[in-house]
Amino acid sequence: MIAPADPARTESTLIKAITTDLAFRAAEHLTVLRGGDGYRPGSLGFGGMADCHPFRIFEGPNDVLFDQVARDYVGSSEESTLGGLLTEQGMPTVDGPLRELMDRPICTESQRVMVAIGRMIGIVSLWRWALDSPDTFEPDELALVRDVCEEELAGECARLLHRQHSGTRSG
């Protein structure tokens, strides 16, 4: 029998995976914006992508982690909606369109959907960690964390809805 994962370790790994993905995406955007110069080894964007890459190599693909976490959390939860599951994981209250996007039943038949749910759990973990560290962040930094996390959650919800409405079941 396999012992359950340490929740603190799982959360720290999720936060590391989410922040690595965000940093890689930001570096990739900067690289593209710089055009041909962005791909030179000395450029800031290219250096940022290179700095993020080792985590992906040594820790394995983030998608595998997100899928496993989602299956663990969905399997142990009694919540039937995505918003309920994320609230159970400590998501602060959200309103408006984001709340409407999350008021959907949890669909577990697709690996891609489970990866998205795991990623959302990681975003909530990052958000909760920032809120639980008020002495570490200034109020404007906490507001930025909230904005980024809400934007990331909305993007994941939109991708989930698109997959469900387009009938995409690959994964």
Identify the meaning behind each predicted range:
Residues 1-171:
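Flavin-dependent oxidoreductase catalytic core characteristic
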